[in-house]
C-alpha cells in the first residue's frame, strides 16, 4: 500500500501487503474470552476480515454494525472484525451494541495479523482500516486497503463480491 493517511497525516504501514490470489496467511489473535483464535479455525467457510483501528470510534463502530447486519443475508460466510483493542473492550462493546454475528478479535498481544496482512500503523500501533475476503480454501479473493484510515470501506463492493 503506497500512500496511507490517518486524519490526513501520512502514516507508515508495516508488514506484507496482500493481493488478490495470495494465500491467506494463518495468524494468531485473541477472542473475547482470551482464547487464541487462528484463521485456520474458520476453514471451509468464506471469511470477511474487517480490519478497524479501534472498535470504540465512530467509523469502526459503524463498520462493525454494518457487517453484523449484513451477516444475516450471507450463507457460509464468517465475518471477523480485528483491531488492537483489548478483548475486554471488544466484549463490552459487542454486548452494548447487540453484535452477535461477527467475531471480534484482538491483535493487541502479538500484532501477528497486522504484520502478516500489512496493516500495522507504525506511528500509532493501531491497525489500518482494510477489508479482506478469503475463500473456503484460504485464498484471498478481495482486498481493500483504505488510503484514508478514517474513511468507510466500500461495503457495496464487498457485498457484490460475496454474492457473485
UniProtKB/Swiss-Prot annotation:
Ranges for domain Thioredoxin: 18-164
EC number: 1.11.1.24
Pfam family, any one: Redoxin
Catalytic site positions: 60
PROSITE patterns on file: THIOREDOXIN_2, TPX
Catalytic activity: a hydroperoxide + [thioredoxin]-dithiol = an alcohol + [thioredoxin]-disulfide + H2O
Disulfide cysteine pairs (residue numbers): 60-94
Superkingdom classification of source: Bacteria
The keyword Disulfide bond belongs to this UniProt entry's keyword annotation: yes
Transmembrane domains' residue ranges: none
GO molecular-function term, one example from the UniProt record: thioredoxin peroxidase activity
Functional description taken from the UniProt entry: Thiol-specific peroxidase that catalyzes the reduction of hydrogen peroxide and organic hydroperoxides to water and alcohols, respectively. Plays a role in cell protection against oxidative stress by detoxifying peroxides.
Other facts noted in the record for this chain: The active site is a conserved redox-active cysteine residue, the peroxidatic cysteine (C(P)), which makes the nucleophilic attack on the peroxide substrate. The peroxide oxidizes the C(P)-SH to cysteine sulfenic acid (C(P)-SOH), which then reacts with another cysteine residue, the resolving cysteine (C(R)), to form a disulfide bridge. The disulfide is subsequently reduced by an appropriate electron donor to complete the catalytic cycle. In this atypical 2-Cys peroxiredoxin, C(R) is present in the same subunit to form an intramolecular disulfide.
Oligomer status and interactors: Homodimer.
Protein name listed in UniProt: Thiol peroxidase
Species whose genome carries this gene: Oceanobacillus iheyensis (strain DSM 14371 / CIP 107618 / JCM 11309 / KCTC 3954 / HTE831)
Name of the gene encoding the protein in the UniProt record: tpx
Amino acid at each position: 500500500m503506497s500512500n496511507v493517511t490517518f486524519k490526513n497525516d501520512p502514516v507508515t504501514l508495516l508488514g506484507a501487503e496482500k493481493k488478490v490470489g495470495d494465500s491467506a496467511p494463518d495468524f494468531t489473535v485473541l477472542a473475547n474470552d482470551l482464547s487464541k483464535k487462528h484463521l485456520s479455525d474458520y476453514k471451509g467457510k468464506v471469511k470477511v476480515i474487517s480490519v478497524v483501528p479501534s472498535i470504540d470510534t465512530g467509523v469502526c463502530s459503524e463498520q462493525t454494525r454494518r457487517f453484523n447486519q449484513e451477516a444475516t443475508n450471507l450463507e457460509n460466510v464468517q465475518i471477523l472484525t480485528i483491531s488492537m483493542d483489548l478483548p475486554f473492550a471488544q466484549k463490552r462493546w459487542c454486548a452494548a451494541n447487540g453484535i452477535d454475528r461477527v467475531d471480534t478479535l484482538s491483535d493487541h498481544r502479538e500484532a501477528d495479523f497486522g504484520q502478516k496482512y500489512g496493516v500495522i500503523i507504525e506511528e500509532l500501533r493501531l491497525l489500518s482500516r482494510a477489508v479482506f475476503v478469503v475463500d473456503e480454501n484460504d485464498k484471498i479473493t478481495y482486498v481493500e486497503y483504505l488510503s484514508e484510515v478514517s474513511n468507510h470501506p466500500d461495503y457495496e463492493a464487498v457485498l457484490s463480491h460475496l454474492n457473485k
